[in-house]
Amino acid sequence: MESLPKTLSTLARLRERDITLTFATGRHALEMQHILGALSLDAYLITGNGTRVHSLEGELLHRDDLPADVAELVLYQQWDTRASMHIFNDDGWFTGKEIPALLQAFVYSGFRYQIIDVKKMPLGSVTKICFCGDHDDLTRLQIQLYEALGERAHLCFSATDCLEVLPVGCNKGAALTVLTQHLGLSLRDCMAFGDAMNDREMLGSVGSGFIMGNAMPQLRAELPHLPVIGHCRNQAVSHYLTHWLDYPHLPYSPE
């Protein structure tokens, strides 16, 4: 977390300019609210890849759940896959067995799954279902899911090793549209950064969209007209925003 002070300083400069901050993520609202509180950050939240939108005060502005019949089919069907299944609702993250390796991405927040019998999961409040595993295996699973669900759900890769089943029409871009309407803003006024296919709609709809250097090749192929900045490990977003604040009229180089 050595880069955290620099990133927080950049975000503080944006707030001083009265620029509205929004974190759009596949992560759970409970985790993100904890992180924002720990860092004393004021920002809107788009979580669960668009399934929830929260205000600065934590008020729920928008929600989108999987239809109960879709959740039931995904949970009860025997899929030909080695991937692990993960279910999300407002109470947290649930899965059927311990997978300690998955918790490495949540070391900072301490957010973790709860072990349950997935077939006893309440079906009426599921926000999304994720499958985590090998990309080739998930690609085959995507075909199975599409054949079973058709147009009743939105499937997307939020990472090469994570395939998500989301409500129809649910994505970060759609959620950002809801938020901008709530704030009386235009998508043309927005700047966004992303690296995976769950960022596609958002990056394609805002006035200034930027693809990370570590992005999935599929995202670059879908949005070839968008500029590519540096790698996330080099704090490329903070680097770009600092340049934008200091030299708004000069061309940017990630070097």
UniProtKB/Swiss-Prot annotation:
Keyword Magnesium assigned: yes
Q: Which cofactor does it need?
A: Mg(2+)
Cite the EC number: 3.6.1.-
Q: Which SUPFAM superfamilies has this protein been placed in?
A: HAD-like
Q: Which InterPro entries match?
A: Cof, HAD-like_sf, HAD-SF_hydro_IIB, HAD_sf
Q: Does the keyword NADP apply?
A: no
A molecular function GO annotation: phosphatase activity
Keyword list (alphabetical) reads:
Hydrolase, Magnesium, Metal-binding
The similarity comment for this entry is: Belongs to the HAD-like hydrolase superfamily. Cof family.
Q: What is this protein called?
A: HMP-PP phosphatase
Q: Which organism is it from?
A: Escherichia coli (strain ATCC 8739 / DSM 1576 / NBRC 3972 / NCIMB 8545 / WDCM 00012 / Crooks)
